[in-house]
Design a protein with these regions (language model features):
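Central helical "cap/lid" subdomain
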Residues: 10-11, 20-81, 143
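Short, structured coil/loop segments at alpha-helix boundaries
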Residues: 3, 47-52, 174, 185
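Conserved flavin/dinucleotide-binding core of flavoenzymes
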Residues: 15-17, 25-26, 65, 80-223
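Catalytic metal-binding/acid-base residues of hydrolase active sites
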Residues: 5-6, 37, 195
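Short, well-ordered beta-to-alpha junction loops that form the rim of enzyme active sites
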Residues: 3-5, 21-22, 114
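A conserved short coil-to-beta-strand element within the FAD-binding core of flavoproteins
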Residues: 2-16
Length: 223
C-alpha cells in the first residue's frame, strides 16, 4: 500500500499489526526500515514500547545532517573527474568539500555541508544556495564558470527522514547498533543504516542491514 504513512505498530502473541491511515495490516512479523530520525521523533507508536535496549540505542545514537548540493555549470572548467577539493575559508566548515562528477554526468560538481549549516541550506532557496556557494566555486574552478542550476537535498525537512546519517554521539557506540539489530520477540526486526555494525552510516550498510533482517525473519518463518 502506497501513500499511507505508518502511525502505529502493535506486537501481539502471534502477530504484528501495522496501522496506516484508516487501515490495518496484520502478519506474523514485520521489518521496520524507517530512518533513525523517524524513530527518534516518535512518529510511529509501538505497542508495547520498544524494549529498553532498543530504546536506549534509538535515543543514544546521534542522527546528523550532511546536505548535498549539486551544481550544474554551462561547461566543465576542470580537467580531473572524480576529484576531491578541500576548501579552507574564513568561515570554518562552510563549503569545505567539493567533488567533480564523472564526465558522463555532465558539468556537475557536488558540495557537502554538515551540521547547522547543512540544516540551514536545506531550508534555503536555490537562489540563496547559489549566491553563497558561487564565490567559492569560482576560487576552485575558475572565474569563468557559469552556473545553470543547483539542487540541494532536503533530508532534514523531510518528515520521513528527519536527517541524513547516524553517528556515535557521546555515550553511544557499536553496542547500540548491535542491540538495534536484535529481533524483538521474534516478531519485529529493525533495519537501516543505523542498525548493525557492518558499514554503518552508509547506503551499503542500510542494504546489508536489510538483508540481515530478512534472513533472520526467513529463518524464523522456516523454523
Amino acid at each position: 500500500m502506497l501513500n499511507a504513512p505508518v502511525t502505529a505498530i502493535a506486537r501481539r502473541d502471534s502477530s504484528v499489526i501495522v496501522r496506516a491511515k484508516d487501515r490495518s495490516f496484520e502478519g506474523p512479523a514485520a521489518i521496520v526500515t524507517v530512518p533513525l530520525g523517524v524513530l527518534k521523533s516518535g512518529a510511529i507508536t509501538f505497542d508495547p514500547p520498544l524494549p529498553d535496549g532498543h530504546t536506549r540505542g534509538v535515543n543514544a545514537l546521534g542522527f546528523g545532517v550532511l546536505s548535498k548540493s549539486y551544481f550544474r555549470f554551462s561547461r566543465r572548467t576542470w580537467d580531473v573527474e572524480n576529484a576531491i577539493y578541500q576548501f579552507l575559508g574564513t568561515d570554518p566548515g562552510a563549503w569545505s568539500q567539493w567533488f567533480t562528477l564523472p564526465s558522463a554526468a555532465g558539468p556537475i560538481v557536488l558540495a557537502f555541508n554538515a551540521g547547522d549549516r547543512g540544516r540551514s541550506l536545506e531550508s534555503s532557496s536555490p537562489k540563496d544556495v547559489m549566491a553563497g556557494a558561487l564565490p567559492i566555486a569560482r576560487q576552485l574552478f575558475g572565474d569563468d564558470i557559469s552556473p545553470v542550476e543547483v539542487a540541494t537535498s532536503t533530508w532534514t525537512i523531510d518528515p520521513y527522514a528527519r536527517g541524513a546519517y547516524s553517528f556515535h554521539a557521546p555515550g553511544s557506540g557499536l553496542d547500540d547498533r548491535r542491540q538495534l539489530q536484535e529481533p524483538i520477540s521474534d516478531r519485529l526486526y529493525l533495519a537501516g543504516e543505523a542498525v548493525g555494525v557492518n558499514n554503518p552510516a552508509t547506503v551499503t550498510g542500510a542494504v546489508l542491514s536489510g538483508r540481515y533482517a530478512a534472513g533472520q525473519l526467513m529463518h524464523r518463518l522456516s523454523g
